[in-house]
Amino acid sequence: VHDAWPDKHLLFTEGCQECGTHLGSWAVGERYARSIIADLNNWTEGWIDWNLLLDETGGPNHVSNFCSAPLIVETARGAVHTLNSWHYIGHFSRFLRPGSRRVLCATTRDDLHATAALNPDGSL
């Protein structure tokens, strides 16, 4: 898309983990990280989760495609569970500041995913 329309801003939207809430699963955060890194390395300027907060069933939802979210609320108790995907998103948000520009980054291992950006203040 970037090659065809380099003047357009690309956003990844509606990221989520399907099939329930996945409480305690590190796989969800790892999946988010791989997706965010791959998208940033391919001209995406932003990454947006579909739902930041859902209830303990992965809803509410009108079509029964229940999902996980970075924050899960137990409605009866009012308890909020912070899933690892919340912390993964927070990690990227902390280091990739508004106005940052992605810079070339490479690894020598196929199982190591990486991205890098130059922030407006000069930090990497």
What are these model-derived regions, one by one?
Residues W5-L10, N42-W47, P98, D121-L124:
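Loop/turn elements at helix/coil->beta-strand transitions in domains of secreted/extracellular proteins
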Residues R97-V103:
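Substrate-binding/catalytic groove segments of enzymes
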